[in-house]
Amino acid sequence: MTSELPPQIQNQIAQLQQVQQQVQALAMQKSQIEAMQKESKMALEELEKLADDAVVYRNVGELVIKTSKEESVSKLKDREETLSLRLQSISRQEERLTTRFKQLQEQIQQALGPKAQ
């Protein structure tokens, strides 16, 4: 059937598939970032339960480093903020791609006309 379609419609279908793949990739990234946010939030909640002078250890690559509660809280809050910004950015990209997907879908349906139904 694809060989019967005009090149312009074939191109639009290819673009539609590409946009669909990008939306799926963004959804996966969004899910990963949300999981990282949840981890950070849980770690912060646990740190808040500790005494201010508690000894805390954190992973840095393959090392475990001794640090203060204050420094750990600060790093986790920075991480949460960064993740939140990335999540907002991904959501905006997702919205744009979803809009583009709908536009391409409509263009293809209009180009195919009553044959598609």
UniProtKB/Swiss-Prot annotation:
Q: Which domain of life is it from?
A: Archaea
Is this entry keyworded Chaperone?
Answer: yes
The GO cellular component terms are:
cytoplasm; prefoldin complex
Where does it primarily localize? cytoplasm
* Molecular-function annotations in GO: protein folding chaperone; unfolded protein binding
What job does this protein perform? Molecular chaperone capable of stabilizing a range of proteins. Seems to fulfill an ATP-independent, HSP70-like function in archaeal de novo protein folding.
- What protein does this entry describe? Prefoldin subunit beta
* Name of the gene: pfdB
